[in-house]
Amino acid sequence: MSEKIRVLLYYKYVSIENAQEYAAKHLEFCKSIGLKGRILIADEGINGTVSGDYETTQKYMDWVHSDERFADLWFKIDEENQQAFRKMFVRYKKEIVHLGLEDNNFDSDINPLETTGEYLNPKQFKEALLDEDTVVLDTRNDYEYDLGHFRGAIRPDIRNFRELPQWVRDNKDKFMEKRVVVYCTGGVRCEKFSGWMVREGFKDVGQLHGGIATYGKDPEVQGELWDGAMYVFDDRISVPINHVNPTVISKDYFDGTPCERYVNCTNPFCNKQIFASEENETKYVRGCSPECRAHERNRYVQENGLSRQEWAERLEAIGESLPEFVGA
């Protein structure tokens, strides 16, 4: 039996001097022990997800905790059967989550160490979900929400996180005077965003401490009131959260049947994320439209070594055709 792989999800807002140099040092250590993953380091802190066997991940956690700046850093641990990453990246960025307040004329950035929403543990958050007078706001990207979300949570009409402040300003009259609680995958986005809401004048702002990942592991709530699966930014794509009464809410793009399998459209210039079974991915050569399925840069065709004839036959089977100028 192969050894279990541990996936570590973590972040910490803390001032890091010479953050760019520290990022290079961090990458060197990770590579030296064979760790895989993706880590962002900025002047404001660190945010990462990494994977490896028990020994490797333990070495990494011990090394991180040996630095007094990260002595109390909270690692959220998942056990998996295979690696969640193929390579190791450590990058220096302006922010460890891209809210982009300064770039989008929202005044100065937020320091969560100074201003942030009230921390709610899983039990308190569940109570908020059941409270009709509380507004629950999902702060993640739209495609994350579509895979899974808390029951009754608002889905902002946004494509990504940095669009959220404008959406809130456009809709603040709907919940300005209400209690608002926010949530995200591991907590890092909510730390900053809930602080921004406080600065905007919202009087009662809470956040799920530790994020969805912690809610799903809590022995008391066991992920209850979560519908679907949780999107993660690694090779797993999704992980289960609700261990009481799990459901599948996402539907196959092609036939509408329950499906939690995300793929990217075969056309690299589209790249739309869609839910598709392996059968339908094959049938529709992973394209979200006739134009994408017949695109000359069709990645599915290239990855699977389909000849032009095989490609044309796939399209003919669904009533479409391959233009004369397109070649495999």
UniProtKB/Swiss-Prot annotation:
Q: What is its EC number?
A: 1.14.-.-
Per its record, what are the GO molecular function terms?
oxidoreductase activity, acting on paired donors, with incorporation or reduction of molecular oxygen
A GO BP entry: tRNA modification
Q: Catalytic positions? A: C184 (cysteine persulfide intermediate)
What Pfam family is a match for this entry?
A: Rhodanese
Q: Which UniProt keywords apply?
A: Oxidoreductase, tRNA processing
Answer whether the UniProt record assigns the keyword Oxidoreductase to this protein: yes
Has keyword Oxidoreductase?
A: yes
| Database matches in Gene3D superfamilies | 3.30.70.100, Rhodanese-like domain (3.40.250.10)
Q: Say which family it is in.
A: Belongs to the TrhO family.
Task: Fetch the HAMAP family from UniProt.
Answer: TrhO
Chain's role: Catalyzes oxygen-dependent 5-hydroxyuridine (ho5U) modification at position 34 in tRNAs.
Stated name of the protein = tRNA uridine(34) hydroxylase
